Amino acid sequence: MPRSLKKGPFVDQHLYLKVLAENEKGSKNVIKTWSRRSMIIPDMLGHTIAVHDGRKHVPVFVTESMVGHKLGEFAPTRTFRGHVKDDKKGKRR
């Protein structure tokens, strides 16, 4: 069930303040965050936000099509190594 429109998007306060500070300065420095639950808002457009995936920070460049999604959607936490291939042709009994 989506969030109520009257509540508005959720953005962690510390992340929002960092984005506003970068907008005031007019600079586009990388902003590090652990807040995967924060929603991408139009104020973040053009910024690179380094989202923590559990072991490192993944840089995410925010574009217009990302607005309304959460930051964690763009930093995968699991790595898929592939299934083990059964090589039955090469084995002899």
From Swiss-Prot:
It comes from Micrococcus luteus (strain ATCC 4698 / DSM 20030 / JCM 1464 / CCM 169 / CCUG 5858 / IAM 1056 / NBRC 3333 / NCIMB 9278 / NCTC 2665 / VKM Ac-2230). The keyword Translocase does not apply. InterPro entries: Ribosomal_uS19 (IPR002222), Ribosomal_uS19_bac-type (IPR005732), Ribosomal_uS19_CS (IPR020934), Ribosomal_uS19_SF (IPR023575). The gene is rpsS. One of its GO terms (cellular component) is small ribosomal subunit. PROSITE patterns: RIBOSOMAL_S19. GO terms for molecular function: rRNA binding; structural constituent of ribosome. The keyword Nuclease does not apply. This is Small ribosomal subunit protein uS19. Belongs to the universal ribosomal protein uS19 family. Keywords: Ribonucleoprotein, Ribosomal protein, RNA-binding, rRNA-binding. Protein S19 forms a complex with S13 that binds strongly to the 16S ribosomal RNA. One of its GO terms (biological process) is ribosomal small subunit assembly. HAMAP family: Ribosomal_uS19. SUPFAM superfamilies: Ribosomal protein S19 (SSF54570). Pfam families: Ribosomal_S19.
